[in-house]
Amino acid sequence: IYLCTNAILLKDFLDRLPLSPYLTLSIHLDGMEEDHDRVVDQKGTFKLAIEAVREAKKKGFRVTSATTFFEDTTLEKAEEFLDYLKPLGVDGITMASAFRYPDAPDQDHFFGRKKTFEFFDKLLEKNKKGRWDINHSPLYLEFLRGKREYSCTPWGNPNYSVLGWQKPCYLLDEGYAETFNELMETTEWENYGHENNKKCADCTAHCGYEATAVEEATSTFRGMVESAKLVFQ
């Protein structure tokens, strides 16, 4: 379970959460303080999130960051932020580029698909000798660099909240199912992905594409070999 949170109240709830290898606290952090607070439109949230990261690590939780880069994120800003996370002991970094989904509060600062690939190709080229602990599979990172073409697997990362199971993914607000079976059986999965739905046209998010990359890496001999080579590069 990846428990996604903005971490504003997380410190107050840590004692209620079980310490488990199957639970990861995924903390929303969209850059350094100025950028993060601007993106979420609330001053002080970056400091609260960082305090929560430190406290969660102190208590023994597995903690990752959930980071979105926007069009105005420079390579220098991204490097500074990723370097900042290292001494905090964050167990992994998940990254995505923002894309213009219908309910996004900010409709003006998005990478297109082409710019996404260009940005991550340059950024990931700087990730030498384990500089950053990136919590993605090797083949997904190749996709993010524009070196592979994948289709979305929208059912690969089911999302549950107090409202129920979100259809089809957390980036598109198209209702909720009361049960997991209802989610799987009533969602028209074939209607999603950048080839099939204009809402998804610029999406490269790991919630849909990581599952596709992992399937290739674990279900084909070629995928296994290519994935292994990338790990040891």
Kindly label every feature range from the protein language model.
Residues 7-8, 29-33, 221-224:
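Short, acidic/turn-prone active-site loops that include or flank metal/cofactor-
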Residues 165-233:
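Flexible mid-to-C-terminal extensions adjoining Fe-S/redox cofactors in radical SAM and related proteins
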Residues 7-11, 75, 79, 186:
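Structural motif corresponding to alpha-helix initiation and N-cap regions
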Residues 4-6, 66-68, 232-233:
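Structural motif
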Residues 16-163, 167, 171-173, 216:
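Radical SAM enzyme [4Fe-4S]-AdoMet core and its adjacent flexible, acidic
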